[in-house]
A protein has these predicted regions:
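Accessory terminal and edge-of-domain segments that mediate assembly/interaction
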Residues: 15-16
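Compact, glycine-rich, soluble single-domain proteins
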Residues: 19-135
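N-terminal Sec-pathway targeting helices
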Residues: 1-12, 21-23
């Protein structure tokens, strides 16, 4: 192989590496994000009965900047439990004005039957679940 051909292949290889690194670092989040001040989280949205019932069940892990946003049809008192949830979670209830009305920290996976219910006295339209220790 001639030196010129080797040089062209090397340059193309370097360009491919630079593009790949740039693309990986510059990927924008496709899904919705929820922010508390400067702390932002990519969230999966649970806005149907099936999605809200399933939630984060049977997940073995959750990225440190990820969570699940539960959206209800109307403001109300929505209890949660940790049935079949494998990771500890923080839960944040928000009203229709997106104001935090209650925080439950470090909800543990359910090992009892029946599982205990996590609730509060207020009214919420949204609940966000994040890794325990995040809220």
């Amino acid at each position: 192989m001639k030196l010129k051909e080797i040089l062209v292949i090397l340059i193309l290889f370097i360009i491919a590496i630079v593009f790949t690194v740039w693309y990986q670092n510059d990927k924008s989040v496709d899904g919705p994000r929820v922010c508390f001040g400067e702390n932002c989280f990519s969230v999966e949205v649970a806005d149907s009965d099936v999605e809200r019932t399933t939630g984060l069940m049977n997940r073995e892990s959750l990225d440190s900047d990820a969570g699940m946003l539960f959206i209800f049809d109307s403001e109300g008192n929505y209890p949660f439990w940790m049935k079949n949830t494998l990771i500890p979670l923080d839960m944040i209830w928000l009203n229709s004005e997106k104001e935090v009305v209650y925080v439950f920290k470090n909800a543990q996976p359910c090992t009892a039957d029946p599982c205990s219910i996590i609730t509060h006295d207020g009214s919420a339209l949204y609940v966000i679940e994040l890794n325990a220790g995040t809220a």
